């Protein structure tokens, strides 16, 4: 009888011990394959625990509280973006949260036009809001430190994928972009810009126009050569994308004569030389296409009268008129007004 009692007690102890071990070390964390759990800055322990319950990552707070007490997590909550994998143990989950071992955010920047676009892009991916980003972008000290003004500010943004922590401050994110911009403009690129009698900011601005003119790599260098020839001979760039930017009418499909007189320093039909700043964030390929533009005699270009996206280039105005007329007929034929 005594032996049965002892075996019974041992069985219960083992059963309870096994259950506790399963709850702590077993794959009890639930997530649809893999999800991200966000802890905002200033969030307390109770809110973290409730969020884990609400999101069905944990099913009970008892063992979470018990283990949190042992790990002294309650007073060490760290904001961040955490990757929770299905089947993770409660111990692993708590260790990750306690250590602040975040999953970084990959901020993918392609083509943006305005600093407001940049602010919204950052706010959509990070804890900081667009207002705090705009505060940094509009700050006089920021502009001075980056040696830019309101028009050239976006030249600090080189399209790429940037890996940063979700709870990084707006200032830290912008500083990261500027740091990468400085790395991009290495000695070789700076020297190529000097050879063109342009600053890196001017190269970037020209590249932004080229970026808006075409997405065809073979044409980018040729278009840049046209702009260089026009600048060097004192001819206005007369670039249609600058009119769209000046008007902030990015959906405009066809530039008409009435649009050309729009009063803005960005309208290169009205003002000679490059606009005072970029009209978008050009790709690194486009920037390099400008830096490596071939030497040509081309002064004019216009899209080919088809859907190829390529352009016809020429030196004489007479030939350009023929090319332009053909393209206008094409637009009329496909109903683009």
Where are each of the predicted segments found?
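Positively charged n-region of N-terminal signal peptides that target proteins for export
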Residues: 1-4
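Hydrophobic membrane-insertion alpha-helices, especially the h-region
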Residues: 7-19
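Signal peptide-directed extracytoplasmic domains
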Residues: 19-185
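Bacterial extracytoplasmic/cell-wall-associated proteins, especially those involved in peptidoglycan
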Residues: 44, 108, 127-128, 142-337
